[in-house]
Amino acid sequence: MPYNFCLPSLSCRTSCSSRPCVPPSCHSCTLPGACNIPANVSNCNWFCEGSFNGSEKETMQFLNDRLASYLEKVRQLERDNAELENLIRERSQQQEPLLCPSYQSYFKTIEELQQKILCTKSENARLVVQIDNAKLAADDFRTKYQTELSLRQLVESDINGLRRILDELTLCKSDLEAQVESLKEELLCLKSNHEQEVNTLRCQLGDRLNVEVDAAPTVDLNRVLNETRSQYEALVETNRREVEQWFTTQTEELNKQVVSSSEQLQSYQAEIIELRRTVNALEIELQAQHNLRDSLENTLTESEARYSSQLSQVQSLITNVESQLAEIRSDLERQNQEYQVLLDVRARLECEINTYRSLLESEDCNLPSNPCATTNACSKPIGPCLSNPCTPCVPPAPCTPCAPRPRCGPCNSFVR
């Protein structure tokens, strides 16, 4: 804090070449630290060698106490500043791992989980595509199965129709055979009747008539009937063989188609069974992948919640540390401002001390060379310098001119 002193008008000379210098015995300071303490000097004629009046001694003592307290306060502030710096350094060293925690392991775990999730998603997509392909293949096989089933039904209906035709032909054959048998019986009956009639006529006529008639040659009915029978039998046999050959051919073709259809049906059924097994296995694997995905999502959610809570705690800790650091910085700025104020006060005090020292030295140069003959402003002799009045005064040393000293720019005072 600045000191306000009432300084009297002082006439300071820059050189003391016109006056003798004060002897070395008279340049000694009467108070400890008086060379560095500003003094309240009223007039150059108020003091003489080794003597001050009471007000000047009290002022010097007061200024000495003030300067000592000021220096003690400066030392105390420097010690406090050093302690605060050490405390800040220790706090920064202690809280450095808290301010910069290592999340590399958590980041690696999160990256691994993300990679697993991506792999699971890709595997899930691949399984979905495979399931869709299996469904499409199953639909194709189902369509083929329906087509083959309709073809089989058509072939079975054709076989049933051919069987009905075969039954009809068999019935026709049996009817024709029955007609042939009836015709044979009728022929036999006609033959027997004819023979009986011939015999009867022979018996009636006897030997009475011998009629020779040139008649046309008789027709052998048996031969005609046999020929007709053979023709019909040949025709029936031909028709039968043709029908049997056609039926055999159709039956063989149908059997081949049935065999091929049954083989294809068995292969299709085996493929359908295999596809059903594959679909069941894929559904089980898909369910397992869904469960794994759900568990991974739950784990990720728990990890995110845990890490978010830890991050909030760390952020709150960082906020507290930043607030403490801001408070410490504000305290440091305030103490720095106080320290700057004290430095300014110290500089002003040093300037005043230098000014007072220059004034004291200039007044010391104005003292006479013989201190015993010095008189005060009232023209009253001041006692001898020595304590023993009988001891003569020692002649002073020869005067050495004082060299001019540089002055301080801001306060226009002498530099030590």
From Swiss-Prot:
The keyword Cell division does not apply. Residues 364-416 are annotated as: Tail. The keyword Manganese does not apply. InterPro entries: IF_conserved (IPR018039), IF_rod_dom (IPR039008), Keratin_I (IPR002957). Keywords: Coiled coil, Intermediate filament, Keratin. Coiled coil: none annotated. Residues 92-102 are annotated as: Linker 1. Residues 220-363 are annotated as: Coil 2. Residues 57-91 are annotated as: Coil 1A. GO terms for biological process: epithelial cell differentiation; intermediate filament organization. PROSITE patterns: IF_ROD_1 (PS00226), IF_ROD_2 (PS51842). GO terms for cellular component: cytoskeleton; intermediate filament. Residues 56-367 form the IF rod domain. The record marks 305 as: Stutter. Residues 103-203 are annotated as: Coil 1B. Residues 1-56 are annotated as: Head. Residues 204-219 are annotated as: Linker 12. There are two types of hair/microfibrillar keratin, I (acidic) and II (neutral to basic). Belongs to the intermediate filament family. This is Keratin, type I cuticular Ha1. It comes from Pan troglodytes.
